[in-house]
Amino acid sequence: MTPGDLLYTKEHEWLRIDGEVGTVGITDHAQKELGEVVYVELPAVGATFDSGGRFGSVESVKAVSELFLPVSGEVVEVNQDLGAAPEKINEDPYGSGWMLRIRLLDRNDVADLMPAEEYDEYTKDDTKEDAKEDAKEDNA
């Protein structure tokens, strides 16, 4: 279930806003597509990024994917636990699998993000295709 209190990007990152700070991670949809996450590259505290800027990467047993910041901001905290336990992204992408916290530089950036219902609609076709592929594998 996609949490309704978050905002989402087409690149499958999520943003939780709390005052002037935003918490960023990847969606459940993204972690399922990636498979088992084995490594995460995240920026240092103090780094600043424009909205849509690359802030790191996540490596899984399937692929390496770049991560993009949903809004412009300055990194104020990085989830250090992911260095030793990147699987938290798979286990709890909206909780203990968060990636970083940023001080928002422009609140207007959130206008380009999707609410949960719109994100669910955006990923619906992908989810159907995944279900078809899983059914084919089960019948093979």
Predicted regions and their residues:
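Small beta-strand-rich domains/subdomains or short beta-sheet motifs embedded
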Residues: 7, 41, 59, 65-70, ...
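Residue-level recognition of beta-strand microenvironments
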Residues: 15-17, 61, 78-81, 107
